[in-house]
């Protein structure tokens, strides 16, 4: 499935970063902070695009469109997960119904395209979807790291569209640093923008929007 391929290529990014820094001393410098680690993996998903046809055959174009669109819509979703956690941790006495109501309200803000009125899917329409996000239970406040990393991964995606070889040089410049620097310094040393800069998110979204709008949907259902 699409998810299987995304997981394999995602984890390959983590493995590649680990292998690249396997001889680093001290060993605590092999890995950077969590959001920086996720750049390795989420970016590798896009670097693997040239091999997508080996997995999807005639459905390759469908996968490319879905993958990029999903990467974009993940950012508001991931931000919503973080916002939800702030709410429930600040108000630990909330009832289950109040938590569900908070999630439903946030869905309307961050993902207004989601249909919250389908009576056939009460688990979702009642605002209980957050219970499926295991990070909320197992790794509190980790999810925003994925959003930061996804923004950088989209930087790499935009670079790849222009020059794959040059994009890979930037990826290697980022990866070989291991955990020797802070997240923002890793980016700076690799010639990348920081996702904390508004221009970064605006830039990658504009590039992705143009690509998606010009995508030939012929034969795709």
State where each predicted segment sits.
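Short, solvent-exposed segments of well-ordered alpha helices
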Residues: 3, 28-35, 68-71, 75, ...
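Catalytic Zn2+-binding segment of zinc metalloproteases
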Residues: 13-27, 47
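C-terminal, non-catalytic "cap/extension" segments appended to globular domains
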Residues: 8-9, 16, 43, 54, ...
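Short pre-active-site segment immediately N-terminal to the catalytic Zn-binding motif
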Residues: 1-9
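Generic detector of well-ordered alpha-helical packing
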Residues: 11-12, 39
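Short, glycine/acidic-rich hinge or "gate" loops at secondary-structure transitions
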Residues: 24-30, 53-64, 163-170
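Post-HExxH zinc-binding segment in Zn-dependent metallohydrolases
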Residues: 21, 31-59, 67-68, 73, ...
């Amino acid at each position: 499935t699409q998810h299987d391929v995304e997981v394999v290529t995602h984890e390959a990014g983590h493995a590649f970063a680990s292998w690249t820094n396997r001889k680093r001393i001290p060993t605590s410098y092999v890995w950077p902070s969590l959001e920086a680690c996720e750049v390795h993996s989420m970016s590798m998903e896009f670097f693997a695009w040239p091999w997508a046809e080996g997995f999807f055959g005639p459905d390759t174009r469908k996968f490319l469109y879905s993958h990029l669109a999903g990467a974009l819509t993940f950012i508001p979703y991931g931000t919503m997960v973080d916002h939800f956690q702030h709410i429930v941790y600040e108000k630990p006495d909330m009832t289950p119904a109040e938590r569900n109501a908070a999630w439903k309200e946030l869905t309307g803000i961050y993902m207004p395209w989601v249909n919250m009125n389908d009576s056939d899917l009460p688990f979702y329409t009642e605002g209980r979807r957050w219970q499926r996000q295991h990070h909320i239970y197992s790794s509190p406040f980790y999810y925003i790291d994925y959003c930061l990393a996804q923004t950088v991964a989209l930087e790499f995606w935009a670079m790849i569209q222009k020059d794959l070889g040059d994009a890979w040089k930037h990826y290697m410049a980022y990866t070989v640093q291991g955990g020797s620097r802070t997240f923002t310094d890793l980016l700076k040393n690799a010639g990348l923008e920081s996702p904390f800069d508004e221009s970064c998110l605006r830039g990658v979204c504009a590039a992705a929007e143009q690509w998606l709008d010009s995508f030939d949907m012929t034969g795709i259902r």
